[in-house]
Amino acid sequence: PRGGVWCYAESDDGVVWNKPDLNLIEYGGSSQNNIYVLGQPQAYTPFIDPNEPDASRRFKSAVNSLRIDTALAHSPDGLRWTEYRDGAAITGRASDTISQVLWDSVARVYRLYTRTDYGTAETGEVRGTRDMVAAADADLSDPDSWTTVREWCLGWERGDDDYHRQRQLYSVNGWMYEGVQHALIWALETGEGETMNAYMATARDESPWNLEWIYGDQRLIARGEEGRFDCRWIQPAPNIVTWNDQHWLYYAGQARSHDGTWSPRLSGPGGGIGLARIRRDGFFSLSSGSGGGSITTRALRFEGQRLTINRTTRAKGSV
């Protein structure tokens, strides 16, 4: 059906997954399946809201519709969903990929990340993103509760209005970690055989995103070798799981480019779900090279007995 099928799975270790029969939705003549959404609305990105006192609205999610906009939904259990205001939109055009709402416990605001469109008849498709905030006690279903704090397209802050011809934003989702916003960026490489890649950016409060990693072509997850299920397409999940001193990021992979071209060397599944693991706090770093180097940090007001550094060195290296 238009909008697709959304399914539920659970796991004790994050690797081996169980797909329970939910008996919620009939599909193919049977309700013995793990489907929790069929058709519209679509693109659920659920989270548990610690700021919500109403148990029936404990889970929240941004959702998209065939109108190509973003609305919000709530649930008591993450499986049975009700749209706020019967699915009335809270944003404008072009939220047609993955939108996300989340709670920022440090700033004590809700944050909403959606795709948007800056294209004209002259430029054609130009995809960007908008980032919005709402107060802790706001009616999240009311568009007037939301304030836009960023609207941007790759290349704008560099004065390059044609950058979108080589790389476009498909979605930007937020992951809050240690009080810092981390953007999980899904991008179309229009100048590279229309492959899809994942990148990361950071921001504090409402300041602009630091995009140096995406401009430096430093992908968060490397695509697989040609012929593997993830050799042409990497789509990151909208959140990261941190446990056992690692960050786990699930992603959807395909051996198909955005233009529909399949890898000619495909020898196994054409798509699937992958898992990327990163050592704790290991997603960004400074590298000195073999010649050594030095850095000067901002002034730090330290209270405690022990200060540690997260570093990796070669066999004869030192700090």
What does each model-found stretch correspond to?
Residues P1-V319:
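Carbohydrate-active catalytic/glycan-binding domains of CAZyme proteins
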